[in-house]
Amino acid sequence: MDSMMNQKTVLAVTDDVVLPVSSVLAIMKELGKEVIESFDPLIITQASTINQFPLDASSVEAVLAISKTSDFPSDKICGEFSRILKPGGTVSVCKVLEGETGEIQQTIQRRVTLAGFLEPQCLDLKSIKLSTFSLSFGIKAKKPSWKIGSSFALKKPVTNLFKIDLDDDVDLIDEDSLLTEEDLMKPQLPVASGCETTKKACKNCVCGRAEIEEKAVKLGLTEDQIENPQSSCGSCGLGDAFRCGTCPYKGLPPFKLGEKVTLSQNFLEADI
């Protein structure tokens, strides 16, 4: 009973009419299958004419296909191999051909790959001695260990975000230490002179205001006309070319209305 439970299921198929069990066991031994005595191969001949194998899905642990023609196994047969094999099971396609085999190897590798098998390997089987036929090469591939429709969680990539170092041991620069004594001193505001705080020039004026007022008196202008010049015609500040004959600002340089009239130091002095 225990030996039957441990017995592994192997399917051997061929496009030939006959396939001896001894040949199947010899090939499986050379392919590296362990405990060969526990194998009880199921043999199907003339498999190229079968549309579907009479086996349940995922019921076979290994498939051995022995082909004597270039068309076997077809894409449809390779799809059947994938259906009946358990996840992680292997398929081995052995060719009985002579002559150039490179193109046929590529064709079989493509077929098993399109059927969903992984890691196809090319095997040299010329060393296997059989009484009924001689092998030239083989292709071995593996069915994925996961089932179609199964899902698994993908690990999300870890994103390295910028990290701010808040180590209190780091020495910080005191902003006040960057200032000199001169920077810390309060600026001294200029002291207003006597003329700036009064409407008229002081008695001992040295800032030049007394001279300006004196020139204004000579022109017959009042202090208000000097400090805040106005014009009813709007042309008094443009210069003598635009002033009328009775303009009080006649003889003065151009100025802006509403701003203090500034007289030069040599104003009203005779030219030499």
UniProtKB/Swiss-Prot annotation:
<keyword id="KW-0001">2Fe-2S</keyword>
<comment type="similarity">
    <text>Belongs to the anamorsin family.</text>
</comment>
<dbReference type="GO" id="GO:0051539">
    <property type="term" value="F:4 iron, 4 sulfur cluster binding"/>
</dbReference>
<dbReference type="GO" id="GO:0046872">
    <property type="term" value="F:metal ion binding"/>
</dbReference>
<feature type="binding site">
    <location>
        <position position="233"/>
    </location>
    <ligand>
        <name>[4Fe-4S] cluster</name>
    </ligand>
</feature>
<keyword id="KW-0004">4Fe-4S</keyword>
<dbReference type="InterPro" id="IPR029063">
    <property type="entry name" value="SAM-dependent_MTases_sf"/>
</dbReference>
<feature type="binding site">
    <location>
        <position position="247"/>
    </location>
    <ligand>
        <name>[4Fe-4S] cluster</name>
    </ligand>
</feature>
<feature type="binding site">
    <location>
        <position position="205"/>
    </location>
    <ligand>
        <name>[2Fe-2S] cluster</name>
    </ligand>
</feature>
<feature type="short sequence motif" description="Cx2C motif 1">
    <location>
        <begin position="233"/>
        <end position="236"/>
    </location>
</feature>
<dbReference type="GO" id="GO:0016226">
    <property type="term" value="P:iron-sulfur cluster assembly"/>
</dbReference>
<feature type="region of interest" description="Fe-S binding site A">
    <location>
        <begin position="195"/>
        <end position="207"/>
    </location>
</feature>
<protein>
    <recommendedName>
        <fullName>Anamorsin homolog</fullName>
    </recommendedName>
</protein>
<keyword id="KW-0479">Metal-binding</keyword>
<feature type="binding site">
    <location>
        <position position="195"/>
    </location>
    <ligand>
        <name>[2Fe-2S] cluster</name>
    </ligand>
</feature>
<feature type="region of interest" description="Linker">
    <location>
        <begin position="157"/>
        <end position="185"/>
    </location>
</feature>
<dbReference type="InterPro" id="IPR046408">
    <property type="entry name" value="CIAPIN1"/>
</dbReference>
<keyword id="KW-0963">Cytoplasm</keyword>
<feature type="region of interest" description="Fe-S binding site B">
    <location>
        <begin position="233"/>
        <end position="247"/>
    </location>
</feature>
<dbReference type="Pfam" id="PF05093">
    <property type="entry name" value="CIAPIN1"/>
</dbReference>
<comment type="function">
    <text>Component of the cytosolic iron-sulfur (Fe-S) protein assembly (CIA) machinery. Required for the maturation of extramitochondrial Fe-S proteins. Part of an electron transfer chain functioning in an early step of cytosolic Fe-S biogenesis, facilitating the de novo assembly of a [4Fe-4S] cluster on the cytosolic Fe-S scaffold complex. Electrons are transferred from NADPH via FAD- and FMN-containing diflavin oxidoreductase TAH18/ATR3.</text>
</comment>
<feature type="region of interest" description="N-terminal SAM-like domain">
    <location>
        <begin position="1"/>
        <end position="156"/>
    </location>
</feature>
<feature type="short sequence motif" description="Cx2C motif 2">
    <location>
        <begin position="244"/>
        <end position="247"/>
    </location>
</feature>
<dbReference type="GO" id="GO:0009055">
    <property type="term" value="F:electron transfer activity"/>
</dbReference>
<dbReference type="InterPro" id="IPR007785">
    <property type="entry name" value="Anamorsin"/>
</dbReference>
<keyword id="KW-0411">Iron-sulfur</keyword>
<keyword id="KW-0496">Mitochondrion</keyword>
<feature type="binding site">
    <location>
        <position position="207"/>
    </location>
    <ligand>
        <name>[2Fe-2S] cluster</name>
    </ligand>
</feature>
<feature type="binding site">
    <location>
        <position position="236"/>
    </location>
    <ligand>
        <name>[4Fe-4S] cluster</name>
    </ligand>
</feature>
<keyword id="KW-0408">Iron</keyword>
<feature type="binding site">
    <location>
        <position position="244"/>
    </location>
    <ligand>
        <name>[4Fe-4S] cluster</name>
    </ligand>
</feature>
<comment type="subunit">
    <text>Monomer. Interacts with ATR3.</text>
</comment>
<dbReference type="GO" id="GO:0051537">
    <property type="term" value="F:2 iron, 2 sulfur cluster binding"/>
</dbReference>
<feature type="binding site">
    <location>
        <position position="202"/>
    </location>
    <ligand>
        <name>[2Fe-2S] cluster</name>
    </ligand>
</feature>
<dbReference type="GO" id="GO:0005758">
    <property type="term" value="C:mitochondrial intermembrane space"/>
</dbReference>
